[in-house]
Amino acid sequence: VTGSAVLVLSGCSGKSEQTEKTLRVGVITYSQDDPFINGLTDELKVQLKAMENKQRRIIVSTKSGNDDQQEQNEKVEEMIDAGCDVLCINLVDRTAPSRIIRMARNEDIPVIFFNREPVREDLMQWEKLYYVGCDAEQSGIMQGEIAAEYINSHPKVDKNEDGKIQYVLLEGEAGHQDAISRT
Protein backbone atom coordinates (compact mmCIF):
# COMPACT_ATOMS: atom_id res chain seq x y z
CA VAL A 1 0.00 0.00 0.00
CA THR A 2 2.77 2.43 0.90
CA GLY A 3 4.59 1.64 -2.35
CA SER A 4 1.50 2.42 -4.42
CA ALA A 5 0.93 5.61 -2.46
CA VAL A 6 4.50 6.68 -3.19
CA LEU A 7 3.94 6.36 -6.92
CA VAL A 8 0.63 8.19 -6.84
CA LEU A 9 2.10 10.99 -4.75
CA SER A 10 5.17 11.34 -6.91
CA GLY A 11 2.95 13.26 -9.29
CA CYS A 12 2.09 15.64 -6.44
CA SER A 13 5.66 16.73 -5.87
CA GLY A 14 6.61 20.26 -6.80
CA LYS A 15 9.60 18.92 -8.73
CA SER A 16 8.95 18.32 -12.41
CA GLU A 17 12.12 17.49 -14.32
CA GLN A 18 13.45 14.70 -12.11
CA THR A 19 10.18 12.87 -11.44
CA GLU A 20 9.71 12.02 -15.13
CA LYS A 21 12.82 9.81 -15.13
CA THR A 22 13.86 9.22 -11.54
CA LEU A 23 11.70 9.09 -8.45
CA ARG A 24 13.67 9.65 -5.25
CA VAL A 25 12.01 8.21 -2.16
CA GLY A 26 13.30 9.00 1.31
CA VAL A 27 12.40 6.54 4.06
CA ILE A 28 13.15 7.67 7.60
CA THR A 29 12.37 5.29 10.46
CA TYR A 30 12.28 5.90 14.18
CA SER A 31 14.94 3.23 14.82
CA GLN A 32 17.17 0.84 12.94
CA ASP A 33 16.90 -1.66 15.81
CA ASP A 34 13.25 -2.65 15.28
CA PRO A 35 12.93 -5.91 13.29
CA PHE A 36 9.30 -5.17 12.35
CA ILE A 37 10.11 -1.72 10.96
CA ASN A 38 13.19 -3.10 9.19
CA GLY A 39 10.96 -5.72 7.58
CA LEU A 40 8.47 -3.06 6.46
CA THR A 41 11.28 -0.97 5.02
CA ASP A 42 12.78 -3.94 3.18
CA GLU A 43 9.40 -4.86 1.72
CA LEU A 44 8.79 -1.25 0.65
CA LYS A 45 12.09 -1.31 -1.24
CA VAL A 46 11.11 -4.58 -2.95
CA GLN A 47 7.69 -3.25 -3.93
CA LEU A 48 9.08 0.01 -5.28
CA LYS A 49 11.80 -1.80 -7.24
CA ALA A 50 9.07 -3.95 -8.82
CA MET A 51 7.31 -0.76 -9.98
CA GLU A 52 10.28 0.49 -11.96
CA ASN A 53 10.06 0.53 -15.74
CA LYS A 54 11.89 2.03 -18.73
CA GLN A 55 10.35 5.45 -18.13
CA ARG A 56 10.76 5.53 -14.37
CA ARG A 57 13.72 4.66 -12.18
CA ILE A 58 13.11 4.58 -8.42
CA ILE A 59 15.85 5.31 -5.92
CA VAL A 60 15.09 4.56 -2.28
CA SER A 61 17.28 6.05 0.44
CA THR A 62 16.84 5.06 4.07
CA LYS A 63 17.90 6.68 7.31
CA SER A 64 17.12 6.17 10.99
CA GLY A 65 16.18 8.68 13.65
CA ASN A 66 17.86 6.43 16.24
CA ASP A 67 15.00 6.93 18.73
CA ASP A 68 15.61 10.70 18.78
CA GLN A 69 13.07 13.10 17.25
CA GLN A 70 15.63 15.87 16.79
CA GLU A 71 17.95 13.49 14.95
CA GLN A 72 15.04 12.30 12.81
CA ASN A 73 14.22 15.92 11.92
CA GLU A 74 17.83 16.36 10.79
CA LYS A 75 17.64 13.17 8.68
CA VAL A 76 14.46 14.46 7.03
CA GLU A 77 16.23 17.73 6.23
CA GLU A 78 19.11 15.74 4.70
CA MET A 79 16.65 13.78 2.54
CA ILE A 80 14.99 17.00 1.38
CA ASP A 81 18.39 18.53 0.58
CA ALA A 82 19.29 15.35 -1.35
CA GLY A 83 16.32 15.96 -3.65
CA CYS A 84 13.77 13.40 -2.47
CA ASP A 85 10.42 13.63 -4.24
CA VAL A 86 8.42 11.76 -1.58
CA LEU A 87 9.12 11.11 2.10
CA CYS A 88 7.96 8.01 3.99
CA ILE A 89 8.32 8.59 7.72
CA ASN A 90 7.91 6.33 10.73
CA LEU A 91 7.92 8.98 13.47
CA VAL A 92 10.00 8.79 16.62
CA ASP A 93 7.35 10.84 18.44
CA ARG A 94 3.88 10.82 16.89
CA THR A 95 3.03 14.06 18.70
CA ALA A 96 5.96 16.03 17.25
CA PRO A 97 5.79 16.05 13.42
CA SER A 98 5.37 19.83 13.02
CA ARG A 99 8.95 20.59 11.96
CA ILE A 100 8.91 17.72 9.46
CA ILE A 101 5.59 18.91 8.04
CA ARG A 102 6.85 22.48 7.77
CA MET A 103 10.07 21.42 5.98
CA ALA A 104 8.21 19.19 3.53
CA ARG A 105 5.50 21.77 2.84
CA ASN A 106 8.11 24.46 2.18
CA GLU A 107 9.59 22.24 -0.56
CA ASP A 108 6.20 20.84 -1.71
CA ILE A 109 7.24 17.25 -0.95
CA PRO A 110 4.42 14.84 -0.05
CA VAL A 111 4.80 12.89 3.20
CA ILE A 112 3.50 9.42 3.95
CA PHE A 113 3.62 8.65 7.66
CA PHE A 114 3.53 4.94 8.42
CA ASN A 115 3.07 2.69 11.45
CA ARG A 116 2.94 5.59 13.91
CA GLU A 117 -0.02 7.81 13.18
CA PRO A 118 0.41 11.51 13.86
CA VAL A 119 -2.41 13.13 15.80
CA ARG A 120 -5.35 14.12 13.59
CA GLU A 121 -4.69 17.87 13.90
CA ASP A 122 -1.19 17.41 12.48
CA LEU A 123 -2.42 15.35 9.53
CA MET A 124 -4.92 18.08 8.72
CA GLN A 125 -2.21 20.78 8.41
CA TRP A 126 -1.62 20.14 4.70
CA GLU A 127 -3.29 18.21 1.88
CA LYS A 128 -0.10 16.30 1.01
CA LEU A 129 0.16 14.45 4.34
CA TYR A 130 -0.95 10.82 4.50
CA TYR A 131 -0.96 7.94 6.95
CA VAL A 132 -0.67 4.25 6.11
CA GLY A 133 -1.27 1.81 8.94
CA CYS A 134 -3.62 -0.74 10.36
CA ASP A 135 -6.88 -0.33 12.23
CA ALA A 136 -5.46 -1.19 15.65
CA GLU A 137 -8.84 -1.49 17.38
CA GLN A 138 -10.05 -3.92 14.72
CA SER A 139 -6.81 -5.90 15.12
CA GLY A 140 -7.46 -6.17 18.87
CA ILE A 141 -11.01 -7.39 18.28
CA MET A 142 -9.75 -9.99 15.81
CA GLN A 143 -7.12 -11.18 18.29
CA GLY A 144 -9.80 -11.54 20.95
CA GLU A 145 -12.06 -13.48 18.57
CA ILE A 146 -9.21 -15.85 17.67
CA ALA A 147 -8.44 -16.42 21.36
CA ALA A 148 -12.13 -17.00 22.20
CA GLU A 149 -12.51 -19.47 19.33
CA TYR A 150 -9.45 -21.40 20.48
CA ILE A 151 -10.55 -21.44 24.11
CA ASN A 152 -14.06 -22.60 23.20
CA SER A 153 -12.75 -25.45 21.05
CA HIS A 154 -10.03 -26.48 23.54
CA PRO A 155 -11.59 -26.72 27.03
CA LYS A 156 -8.31 -28.03 28.49
CA VAL A 157 -7.00 -24.45 28.25
CA ASP A 158 -8.86 -23.86 31.54
CA LYS A 159 -6.10 -25.54 33.56
CA ASN A 160 -7.78 -25.30 36.96
CA GLU A 161 -11.29 -25.87 35.54
CA ASP A 162 -12.79 -22.85 37.29
CA GLY A 163 -14.44 -21.45 34.13
CA LYS A 164 -11.94 -18.60 33.96
CA ILE A 165 -8.87 -18.26 31.81
CA GLN A 166 -5.76 -16.85 33.42
CA TYR A 167 -3.44 -15.20 30.95
CA VAL A 168 -0.60 -12.78 30.53
CA LEU A 169 -1.17 -9.97 28.05
CA LEU A 170 1.93 -8.61 26.35
CA GLU A 171 1.23 -5.09 25.15
CA GLY A 172 4.02 -4.57 22.64
CA GLU A 173 6.02 -1.38 22.36
CA ALA A 174 5.41 0.83 25.38
CA GLY A 175 3.49 3.96 24.46
CA HIS A 176 2.77 2.94 20.85
CA GLN A 177 -0.82 3.97 20.09
CA ASP A 178 -1.54 0.81 18.06
CA ALA A 179 -0.30 -1.47 20.85
CA ILE A 180 -2.45 0.44 23.34
CA SER A 181 -5.55 0.27 21.11
CA ARG A 182 -5.12 -3.45 20.47
CA THR A 183 -4.98 -4.24 24.15
What are these regions (language model features)?
Residues 12-183:
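A residue-level marker of the well-folded mature domains of exported/periplasmic proteins
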